[in-house]
Structure formats: structure tokens, C-alpha cells
């Protein structure tokens, strides 16, 4: 009897020692009264603290920045697995959450660290890992992140200081997904090829207009994604998260891009993203992605918690829809591999259709003033809320289409192109002898940079 008593007592002591004090895991953001975001070292240290506190979190790095800083990534899996093969064997889907590709917009970093703490350390939402494993990149662009200052986003309402838009080479990483000039992007592409996440959430803060919504979103649902995956994003994902966010008094709205920038009454445009952008690149790989754009004029606390809730609700749906999403993507991948795209016209550019619908934009009243500096017009928002009934041009139609060739031939002197093919995991073979092949060739008449 005494032996049993001692054993029970020891178990009780062990249990007490493992009890988590929530205050010990407050983030820098929370400790600052929701006004500040941590620097690189503080962010990495906190991520390692979470790893030490939870057996289901693994800390790793995906590569280095141009200046040699590690790009951190957390792997969160209910079994503590850190290898993609083992996670895939269990049938889990993989969700990638990334922040600070534009380090002046750090909302997703602070939201992500709080959410992963609540899931894996405080055990508030263990159900979010039932059928989903999470990858979290808190700082995609470490060098840009450490170009820290209070004036990097002069029209943004917090945090007190933030990083810079580009990396140390002055490259905008969210325009680099195809050309992959930056070492950060080359590392990211290798990670993406290894994990191939079914869903990516890319966290940003927007520029521009004033309105009620704490966040807006972009999703590739206008023609450049396979139709079944498009239907899932529109009818399953967006319908679910928009309803949930509305109930939380955090309404969502499509990314606001006025047809004429200085005239909100001109209506709203939709668009398809090029593959140089994250959501466009995910679409080109037959994967779903969401662009999160919190509203720059909202205070930092509001923006971070709106991001937190959207990330959480996204994970709820991913667990509900894991098999469905996995099956849709598997079928699309299979059709792509079989060459189904070669049988039909392939759109290479889109334009906005003239058709529109009337939507209610929860906006703000404004006046048009003459600028003393430029003499041009500028919009001055009054801060008073107003519902605007305006047209939303929500249809995109192909501007140019083409028949995809059976293959492309890349001359060996274009070694940079060949390296890029490797980075994008594009399969190709090398000719081992001279041969004559009848081909069609393209000539680029006009090139421009963005």
C-alpha cells in the first residue's frame, strides 16, 4: 500500500510541476499593452520558448537571409512529428501561416505566436490539430525586419516601430515567387516543394482607403485556379470564415481596390494575381491560399486580434474539410500530370469584365481637397461611418489565351533559367546528343518590371 501511495504522490508532484502559468507565456506584444512588436531575436527566443514548453512544436530554419540571419519556422503536429513523410502517412493536411514577408506589416507574426501558444502550450484548442499540421514562419524577411523604425509605414496606426518592406538587397519578396532572385525566396521554394501545403495564409497590412472592416482579403477565385478548387474556396472556405468573423463583429470584405483610386464611387475592381505574388504562386501549384490584409488605420491591437481570429477559424474549417480539400487537390494534380491542360485554351492574361453587381461597402464619409503641395485632388476622410452602395466588378475574363506546347526547349547557356526550374520542382530531361527538332519560338516585344 505504501508503494502505491508513494507512486501516486510522485505522479501528483510531476503533474503540479508541469502546470503552465499563462503569465509566463505572454508575448512581447501583450506585455507592451498591445502597442509593440518584438525584434528578430525576441521573436526567435519566444518561438524556442514555445518549443521547449510543448512536445508537439518543433523549431527549425528553412535557410538564411542575404545578411546571414536564419529564417525560422515552427512545425506544429499533435504527434510531435517534424518530417513531412510521417505527417502525410497519417493523412493530415498541412497549413502554412507566414508573416513578415513585408516586415512593416507584422500583424501575423504576433497573432501567430499567440495562437500557437494557445493551441500547443495552453491546450485551449487541441481540436485544431486533429487533421491539420501547421507550419508557421514568423519572419519571412529577417533583414527587412531588422531595419526597424517608427516611420517605415508612416500612414499605419502601429505598432510603435516596425520593419521595412524589402530585404537587404532591396528586393520585394512578394514579387519574387517566380524569378526567385532573393536567397530568402530560394529557401522558401525548397521548403514549399518539400511540404506542399494544401493551404497558405499570407499575412499583410493594407494601404489606402478608410473603411469599417478590420481586415480585407484576396483569394484566387476569378479564373486562374482550377474550377473545383475555386468552387471550394468560394463556397466552402469563404462562406464559412466570413460568417464566423461577422459573428465576432470582425466583418471581412474583398481587398478594396477602387477602379479610380481617388473616386470611391467609381466602384471596386477584382483581379487575378500573377504567380510573382504568394496567392498567385499557390494557385499555379494547384494549392489554395488566402491573402490577409488588415486595415492600416485600425489600431494594432484590433488588427492583430482580427488576424488571430481569422487564422483560428481557418484552422477550424481545415479540420472539417481536410478530406474534401485533400481529394480535390489530388485530383487536380493528377489531371495536370496527365496533361489535361494541353487539351484546352490556357488563359495567360485576364481583364475585368464590364458586368458588375451592387454591393454595400461599410465605408467612411470623405471630402475631396486640393493639395497645397501638388495642386492635385486628395481624399480626406472624416471618420464618420457611411454605407456606400457601389458597383463591384467581380468578374474576370481571359484577355489572351494560348495552346500550351508539349514541351519547352531551354538552351544550356540559360543556366539561370535551369536553376529556376529546379527551384520550382519542374520536371525536365536533358538531351544527351545533338538532334533536330521543329519548334515554334516566342519573341518578347516589350518587357516591363514591377
Where are these regions (language model features)?
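Structured catalytic-domain cores with a bias toward divalent-metal coordination
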Residues: 16-450
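Sec-dependent N-terminal signal peptides
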Residues: 4-13
